[in-house]
């Protein structure tokens, strides 16, 4: 009996060492809301490609078409993600995310309707790239952690690690979930993904206290144009780098 108690105590101690730091971060005010919200809103990343593949094969009986559409969405995502990230830095998280989400929702509804009604293939080609209109939730979440924990290197590293854990969980859950729902109904899979986007976005974007300021806001507060502000910050970074290297 004592051996079992010792094993249980050891497991508890290891779990505390591994997850205790994460729990501490999530107990901080406002952090659980935006962290969990970002994961929920990220569900299109693992789910859309699988949903397109299974739905197109079901309605069109063509794996080649499904593969091409999935590739188009992936390429569009690779192009749009850094561009959206840059816009977020310039104009702010809410200012960029809200119109981006609206584009995604309209595109998802249009593509789902087109697939279920067996629309001409060219319609699918035109609509699919717009499903890459996904805000960079992971990057925005990490930006919030970095801003909140500025100066605390240890907890910042732990927070970024936690963000990585959440990302992995999203992919582990999202792919099989998308497969299951899409086999039942492509409409169900897209609808579920859309609900995740709306719920996650509301959780994340309505948490205003942790949102970092955009370059536009910082420049306005400094009485500078955005270009002047960027040049000033670049000069500061150069001076800091010179001091560190000297």
Task: List the predicted regions and their residue ranges.
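Helix-loop boundary and gating motifs at the non-cytosolic
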Residues: 12-78, 239-246
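Helix-to-loop junctions at the C-terminal end of transmembrane segments
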Residues: 80-93, 182
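C-terminal ends and interior cores of transmembrane alpha-helices
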Residues: 102-118
């Amino acid at each position: 009996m004592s051996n079992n108690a010792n094993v249980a105590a050891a497991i508890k101690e290891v779990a505390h060492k591994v997850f205790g730091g994460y729990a501490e971060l999530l107990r901080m005010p406002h952090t659980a809301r935006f962290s969990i919200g970002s994961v929920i809103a990220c569900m299109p990343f693992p789910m859309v490609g699988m949903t397109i593949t299974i739905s197109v094969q079901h309605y069109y009986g063509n794996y080649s078409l499904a593969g091409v559409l999935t590739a188009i969405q992936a390429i569009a995502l690779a192009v749009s993600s850094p561009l959206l990230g840059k816009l977020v830095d310039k104009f702010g998280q809410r200012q960029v995310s809200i119109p981006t989400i609206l584009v995604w929702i309209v595109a998802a509804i249009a593509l789902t309707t087109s697939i279920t009604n067996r629309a001409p293939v060219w319609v699918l080609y035109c609509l699919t790239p717009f499903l890459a209109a996904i805000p960079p939730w992971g990057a925005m979440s990490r930006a919030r952690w970095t801003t909140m924990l500025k100066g605390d290197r240890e907890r910042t590293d732990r927070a970024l690690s936690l963000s990585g854990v959440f990302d992995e969980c999203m992919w582990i859950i999202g792919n099989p979930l998308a497969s299951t729902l899409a086999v039942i109904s492509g409409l169900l899979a897209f609808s579920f993904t859309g609900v995740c986007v709306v719920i996650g976005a509301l959780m994340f974007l309505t948490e205003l206290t942790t949102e970092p300021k955009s370059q536009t806001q910082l420049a306005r507060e400094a009485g500078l144009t955005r270009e002047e502000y960027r040049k000033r910050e670049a000069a500061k970074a150069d001076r800091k780098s010179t001091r560190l290297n000297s």
